[in-house]
C-alpha cells in the first residue's frame, strides 16, 4: 500500500507540473524561417500560428508553389523549435519523477 500511496503522490505532482508547464508554454513564442529569413512564421508554445511574414521578393503570382513550399518549411522549422523547447521544459519540470521506459511527456 505504501508504494500505491507514493505512486498517487507522484501522479499528483506530475499533474501539477504539467499544468504549470502548459501555462508557461502559452507564453513562449518561437520563430521559424526559410529562404534565409524571407519567410517567417511565429508560433506560440502550444503550436498555434500567431503570424506569417513574407518578403515581397518571394511572392510571385506565376510561381505560387515555391511560396507554399517556403511557408511549409518555415512552419516545420518553428514546430521543431517548439518541440525542442517543450522537451527541455518537460525535462526540467519532471526531473526526479520516474517514468516507465518509453513513456513520453507531454501525454
From Swiss-Prot:
UniProt entry tagged with the keyword DNA-binding: yes
Cell compartments where the protein resides: Cytoplasm, Nucleoid
InterPro entries from the UniProt entry: YbaB-like_sf, YbaB/EbfC
GO molecular function: DNA binding
Highest taxon above the source species: Bacteria
Gene Ontology CC: one annotated term: cytosol
Biological function: Binds to DNA and alters its conformation. May be involved in regulation of gene expression, nucleoid organization and DNA protection.
Protein's name in the database: Nucleoid-associated protein RC1_2305
Organism: Rhodospirillum centenum (strain ATCC 51521 / SW)
Amino acid at each position: 500500500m505504501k508504494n500505491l500511496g507514493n505512486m498517487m503522490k507522484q501522479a499528483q505532482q506530475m499533474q501539477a507540473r504539467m499544468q504549470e508547464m502548459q501555462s508557461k508554454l502559452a507564453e513562449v513564442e518561437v520563430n521559424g524561417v526559410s529562404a534565409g529569413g524571407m519567410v517567417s512564421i511565429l508560433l506560440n508554445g502550444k503550436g498555434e500560428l500567431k503570424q506569417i511574414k513574407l518578403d515581397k521578393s518571394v511572392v510571385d503570382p506565376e510561381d505560387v508553389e515555391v511560396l507554399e513550399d517556403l511557408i511549409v518549411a518555415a512552419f516545420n522549422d518553428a514546430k521543431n523549435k517548439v518541440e525542442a523547447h517543450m522537451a527541455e521544459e518537460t525535462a526540467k519540470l519532471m526531473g526526479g519523477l520516474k517514468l516507465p521506459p518509453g513513456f513520453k511527456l507531454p501525454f
